[in-house]
Structure formats: C-alpha cells, structure tokens
Amino acid sequence: MISLCSDWEFTREWSAGFAHGEGRFPLVDLPHTAGEVPLHYAKPEDYAGICGYRRGLSVPLEYRGKRLFLQFDGAAHFAEVYLNGEKLAEHACGYTAFRVEITSAVRYGMENRLAVRLDTTENPAVPPFGFVLDYLAYGGLYREVWLDVRGADVIEDVFVTTPTLTRAEIALTVSGSGARRRVTLLDAAGAVCAMAEGDDNKYYVNYSNARPWSLDEPNLYSICAELLDASGAVTDEKTVRFGFRTAEFRRGGFYLNGERVFLRGLNRHQCYPYMGYAAPEALQREDARILKEELCCTAVRTSHYPQSRHFIDACDELGLLVFTELPGWQHIGDAAWKRRSVENVREMVTQYRNHPSIILWGVRINESLDDDDFYRETNALAHSLDPSRQTSGVRYLEKSHLLEDVYAYNDFS
C-alpha cells in the first residue's frame, strides 16, 4: 500500500468550499490530532469540533483497469470522505479502520483532491458517546491513511485459524471473476514452508515443523494468498501474519497451547499528553514493550476500544496476550446506536482476527446494564466471524446476565 500520511492541509473550521479546494491552510502529517491538548485543564473545545483534512492525490494512467481503495486506519469520530468535491463515503467509528473504493471517481493522469470532513465531537448517535465517558475521546486523522492499488479481481480478506499446532486453515474472501488461487505458508525469514493451489476459497496447510506461538517464543508465520490468471501470472495478492497456537479459557483457567498460563495484566488507553490519540508507531510499540518487559505483564486489555495495529503487532512479536473490546463505557443508546455498535464488532473482529496475541473478544459495553437481545447479537456475530476465539464483556454488577463465554468483572472492593 502507498502511504498518504504527508502534506495534508488542515483546518479546524470546516466549510463546504474546503472539499472543492477553496483557501489555503497549514500542512500537517499523519498521525495528527485535531487539537493540541494541554497537560492540565483541557476543555472540550480544545480538542473537539468539525475540522477538515485535504491533500492532492496523483493517480498515474497505468492504474487504469485496476481497483483503487483508500484505507483510513483511524478517523475520530465521524468521517465523510470527498474526492474532487464528491462525497463518496462516511464512517461512524473512531476506533476501527475503513476502506473507500475510488476506482470510478478518480481522474487518471491528473491531480485529484482528497478531503475528509471530520466531526470530532461527542456525537450521541455514535458509540461510545451518548453519556459521560471516563476517558477523553480525542479527534483527528490519528492513524495512517493509505492508497491500495489492486487487480481487477481482489482478495478482500484472508482469515487464518490454527485448530492444532501444526495445521493452518485459510479462508479467502475474493471479489471478481473466477481466478485461480494459491496460498503459501512462509516462515519469519520468508522461506516457503508449504503451498496449496486450487479454485476454492478454503485451504488447509499442514506443517509438522511449525514452531508454536507462545509468551516466551512468539514465533510468527505468514500466509501469502495470490490470484492467478490463465497463464499463471499473479494478478492480486494479500499477505497476513499469524501464529500457530491454541487458546482457551476453561473452568480451571486460561490455557495457551494446552498449558495453563497465569494472566497478569493492565488496562491500556491509547492517549498521550499534548498529542491525544496521535501517537506514532514507535510510541505504540514502546507501550507494548513496557508492559511486557518492564511491568512483567502477560496480558493487556485495550480499554475501551480497538487500538492501533502497531500496538497489536508489537504484542504479537513480544508474546503479550490481548483482550480487545468494542467501543463503549456504561451507556447503551437507541436502536440505531446499537446497530452501529454491532457494526463496530464486525469491524473489530474482521480487522484483528489474524493476530495470535488476541485471545478474547469483548462484545459487551464496559460496565453496562443488561440488554440481552443486544448482547445475544454481538456474541453471535463475533462467533460467526471467528469461531476460534471466545467472547467476554466486563461488568461491575455481580448478578448481571452472562451471555458471553468468559465471565469478566471489575472488582472495586
């Protein structure tokens, strides 16, 4: 993917003309916070409002015939995406990534104008908002933005599970015509370990020499999925990283690769003084290192929302277990709010389910009251998207209904 993190014009006062190129504004790079946050006594207007980001996008003529996507890793909190003044998409979650296809809207061989209208206020229609939060929800294009140039047929997703420590099961999601598929298992050095080819979207790879992913030896592998034309040439590819490991909560505790592991962990928020959420990759990785190497944690909870892929990547590499959860804090909104929250679960699971460090999906709004129909839906969705992991949800009422697989409770005694 091509980075689009530099040379964005930024304004804290959006106007309709901004999407059409009116005015000139200071340049910023991503990740970026919409308002610099003082160390003490911040007011909402210091970091919240309706702002705009804009930059040029050159698309060469040789991209004709390909499919072009913009990927936003984190746009807090309600984003509208414009290309050459035309609104193409909107996204109502500041904590999950989203993609926008621009193939039919782009001007080839010319400079295009990409603009984002970003509402960083606490919109009660958008989870986690609607009541008070016990954390500050900073705004901005605070994670990376990319241009993804793909073939006419596209591998949308690659999902890898490891039912045993020597077997990988691969599920592909492909859009387009009936291209032939090839999946290749690679070790950390890029050496080929195994390969499978066919016309289906499900493959099984056995590798007797696989080294399991564990806390002490977090061995990582990759699956490279490719689409092939009639001549055998690669027309599209997607690579994901994973680890051979089994993870299960049982009555007697948590078991990784069949061995009981004591979970000693902390909650982690993604905010920093002055920069809000807009921490670069190095800081995201440093937090994971501190948790594992200095604080001797075996686990971390991403309270109370999905966090940077750089942080989760570092957890994969260091051997730090992760309990990640949907955005929210105590409040449950109306029916439309719940539908958005369910969509948050869908995005969270599909975007993070290949990470071996993640052992638990949090599908209950933190410390919320019971809402059985809502939580049956979030649980069922997580299980359907990822049958390999269990669900949980943190509560503070002892007698609340347990619909998840694993009981989680905040003990404030």
What are these model-predicted stretches?
Residues 1-37, 117:
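Accessory carbohydrate-binding/adhesion or oligomerization-edge regions at the termini
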Residues 2, 8-15, 44, 48-154, ...:
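Accessory beta-strand-rich segments of carbohydrate-active enzymes
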Residues 85, 145, 221, 258, ...:
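Conserved, mostly hydrophobic/aromatic
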Residues 88-89, 193, 261:
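Short hydrophobic beta-strand segments in globular cytosolic domains
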Residues 107-111, 175-250:
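Extended acidic/polar, glycine-enriched regions
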Residues 151-177:
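Surface beta-strand/loop "capping" patches
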Residues 158-161, 212, 224-293, 313:
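N-terminal carbohydrate-binding accessory modules
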Residues 299-413:
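Substrate-binding/catalytic cleft of secreted carbohydrate-active enzymes
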